[in-house]
């Protein structure tokens, strides 16, 4: 499990909640850090903030999907942007789920549990 968010408070909130649910969690501060860590960590699921410096979530998710070594990793985009065109963009990239901030930690945990070990399919 890899949690990617430039906001330390949100990153730690997600990581702590997932750790309490039994997930082994690694964190990254932005998209570039995510791409550096993903090959060595081989996570099953990545929670990925959209708005980040250096490399945003859109570009990071696209690069994950284009790389055969990371294309099968489940990706949950998390964003304050709740417009349908943002969700559509996520579907076009091939992310597995899209959560909007503020999100219910229980919902995030449910989504991550469903995706852990599930085949890669764009969210509904």
Walk through the language-model features, giving the residues of each.
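Short, glycine/charged-rich "phosphate-handling" switch motifs in NTP-dependent
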Residues: 96
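Charged docking surfaces used in two-component/phosphorelay signaling
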Residues: 12-20
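Receiver (REC) domain active-site loop signature in two-component systems and cognate sites
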Residues: 52, 75
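Short hydrophobic/Thr-rich beta-strand motif most characteristic of the beta2 strand and flanking loop
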Residues: 22-29, 37
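Active-site beta3 strand of CheY-like receiver
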Residues: 41-47
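C-terminal output helix
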Residues: 103-113
